[in-house]
Amino acid sequence: MCGRVRLSSDYSEIKIKLKFDLDAPAPNFEADWNKPPTAPMLVAIRSVDGKRTPKMMRWGLLPHWAKDEKIAYSTFNARAEEFTTKPAFRDAWKRGQRCLVVTDGFYEWKKLDPKGKEKQPYAIAMADDGQMVMAGLWAKWKDPKSGDEIQSCTILTTSPNEVMAELHDRMPVILDKADWPKWLGEESAPDEELLAMLRPSPDRVLKVWPVDKKVGNVRNRGAELALPI
């Protein structure tokens, strides 16, 4: 599971690292150290002209058939082992609506007792302090009442590596840089190869540290949330 992420990096640096289309309008986002589901997320998609394009999308995928937005609270993650057949995600997969979800890292809560009543939050980041780029899917949804179109996304999850297994039984799929072009469809790849990318990250690429429990409150969004305790 991945239910909180952070992104505070400067966009001018992100667009170079991610090789975004430099002519694309800069997305409007603010630094946020505690993004919950339904928050706007910075993603990259392959546009109709083949360019790597930045977008802001709501976190929590809204399939085209959804009656309302409530489903987003259960679709912010998609399990790599089953998303291709799940009604909420399979259309996005079949249509090739894959994306890169750009973050600086995420948080996870470790149970301190068997019943999970007491938990300690941890921050997870790349060991080299680089961007953490997660595998995602995206979709368009039209609000039946207002007629507004909403673009939304989900983060794919997989089994944990040894580092993450100490905290949780799932982790987000963090894509290798070499896999970005194929995941976005900039380079062709069979489904089998794409699905093989959805694996746990090597332990060495991540670092983990405990943080203040204030991160549990989504009203708290500042930089102090990611500081080690």
Range-by-range predicted roles:
Residues 1-229:
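Short linear sequence motif anchored by a di-proline
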